[in-house]
Amino acid sequence: MSQASARHILVDSEQQCLELKQQIEAGSDFAEVARQHSNCPSGRQGGELGTFGRGQMVKEFDEVVFSGALNEVHGPVKTQFGYHLLEVTSRT
């Protein structure tokens, strides 16, 4: 079964998501941005979601996590929870 590790930042608006993505692409640390801005409890751990299998997260997550490039910031990804930036840190 495929497994992946990822981290994310959850915010309420697409605009905020885009602004945070620009900060990260300009050199800000993903984990620090997650700690400061993410609405998810994982933000306290730098957005780390740990390791999970296909189907354990919402469909929109799976599509990015199991097909997107590693160590790149993906998003905004819209789910029922809000807007996410995702970074896939490993995949097997």
Label the model's feature ranges:
Residues 26-31, 71:
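Glycine-centered tight-turn and secondary-structure capping sites
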